[in-house]
Amino acid sequence: AYLGGRMNYFSGNYTGYVTTRLKSNDASLLDIELDCDQTGWGITPIFGLDYKIGRWNIGAKYEMRTLLNIENTTEKNSDPEGALSDFKDGVNTPNDIPAMLSIATSYRFTDRLRASVEYHFYDDKHAGMANIPGTNIGKQHALTHGTNEYLAGAEFDLNKTVTVSAGIQRTDYGLSNNYESDTSFSCDSYSIGFGGAIKLLPKLTMNIAYFWTNYSDYTKAVEASSTGGYNGTTLAGTNVYSRTNKVFGLGFDYKF
C-alpha cells in the first residue's frame, strides 16, 4: 500500500497573433494579438496498492483532483472583453488536474520477457476548467464523458546489459463542439513507442526512447445565422483542429 502526494507547479506562455479576412469583400474577420504568462500550483494526494503473486503483478493508483488556478500576467491582449477574455491581466482561471484512476497488471513470461496492460480514467467532467467562450459555464460540462486511456507494452532483456521495449496507447476524450475552441482543444489519439535501456555501470543505466502520436482531426462546423454564424460573420464555416507529436527521450538512472 502507498500513501503520498505530489506538488505541481505550472508555468506557461501564450504568444502569437491571428489575422483573418473574408475573400468575398476583403472585410476583416479576426485580428487579435496575445502575449500572456501563466503560473499556478496545487497538491495532489495519491493512494496506491500493489500485489504480487507468482508471475503476476497487479497494481492500482488513485490520484485525487488537484485544485489549480492559473493566474495571468499579460503584456499584450488586443481583445480582453471578447475572444481573449480568459487572458486578462491578473485574472485567475480554474485549470484543475482531474482525479485519475489507474489499474494495471503485468506478467513475467520468462526471466527475460515481461508484458503489461493498463487502464487510466481521468474524471475531467468534475475538474474545474475555463468557461465556454461567451458563457459562464465551465468547459468540463461540455464533455460527454471523462478521458479513457488503454495501454499495453512489453520488454525483453537481450542480455544482462541491454533491454528493449515497445508499447501502444489509445486515448479517447469525450469531445464536443462547445469544448473545442481556437485557444484550447484536444484530439483523440493513439501512440506507439519504442525504447531501450543500457546498463553502463553496475549502478548506472541509460534509458532511450522514441514516442510517436497520431491524432484524429476534430471538425467543428458552424451553421449560418443572422445573429451569429462563423466568428460573427452570419456565414457558415468550419474549423478543423489537428496536431502532431513526436518525442525523443534520453535519461539516466543511478542506484545509490
How would you label these PLM feature ranges?
Residues 1-256:
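Outer-membrane beta-barrel porins/channels
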